[in-house]
């Protein structure tokens, strides 16, 4: 991503593809972040680095990075649901196996309530993930169709509707 001359905000950013074997780029610093460390976030400094424009000028942030973010957010939401399911399964198994005062601790109201709340949040997160993925899929399908042929006015309205829904729901799903 690179800012274009004469712009002051994210609307002026363009996206470029760069071959690191050509040199000219240094990593200034790596961000220290919480969560998944397999994909580092870093600040890059370019010095006479040759790159190819990716897509259209000044649409790097708005169109391309946001599309990448929506995909990444869905992936994070799916990981969250999977981890939550595993945690619930472990907690449930433990509550059934662990005995206290001659009975399984799942029979104690406080433990049962904790597991019920955990299951409710898990089911809500899964539903949010599936609905968000549905919105993204419909938007992408209409986007693909628009590259093949001109969309009807109704299809264009649907495309805008599902783009807004996808853009609204993906940050929610990520924060599950």
Question: Residues of each region from the PLM?
Answer:
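A short core secondary-structure module
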Residues: 1-25
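Short Gly/Pro-enriched turn/cap motifs at secondary-structure boundaries
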Residues: 7, 33-40
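Short C-terminal domain-edge/linker segments immediately following a structured domain
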Residues: 9-14, 46-49, 74-78
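Gly/Lys-enriched N-terminal cap/neck module of very large, oligomeric protein machines
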Residues: 15, 30-33
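A glycine-rich, basic-preceded beta-loop-alpha segment at the flavin cofactor/substrate interface
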Residues: 19-28, 40-72, 89-107
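Alpha-helical interface subdomain recognition
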Residues: 45, 70-176
């Amino acid at each position: 991503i690179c800012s274009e001359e004469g712009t002051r905000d994210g609307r002026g950013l363009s996206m470029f593809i760069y071959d690191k074997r050509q040199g000219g780029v240094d990593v200034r610093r790596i961000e220290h972040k919480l969560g998944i460390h397999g994909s580092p976030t870093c600040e890059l400094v370019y010095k006479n680095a040759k790159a190819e424009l990716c897509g259209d000028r000044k649409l790097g942030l708005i169109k391309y990075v946001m599309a990448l973010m929506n995909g990444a957010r869905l992936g994070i939401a799916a990981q969250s649901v999977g981890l939550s399911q595993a945690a619930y399964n472990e907690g449930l198994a433990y509550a059934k196996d662990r005995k206290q005062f001659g009975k399984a601790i799942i029979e104690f109201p406080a433990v049962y309530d904790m597991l019920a709340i955990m299951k409710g949040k898990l089911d809500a997160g899964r539903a949010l993930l599936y609905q968000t993925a549905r919105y993204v899929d419909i938007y992408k399908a209409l986007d693909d169709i628009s590259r093949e042929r001109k969309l009807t006015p109704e299809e264009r309205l649907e495309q805008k509707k599902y783009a807004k829904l996808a853009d609204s729901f993906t940050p929610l799903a990520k924060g599950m």
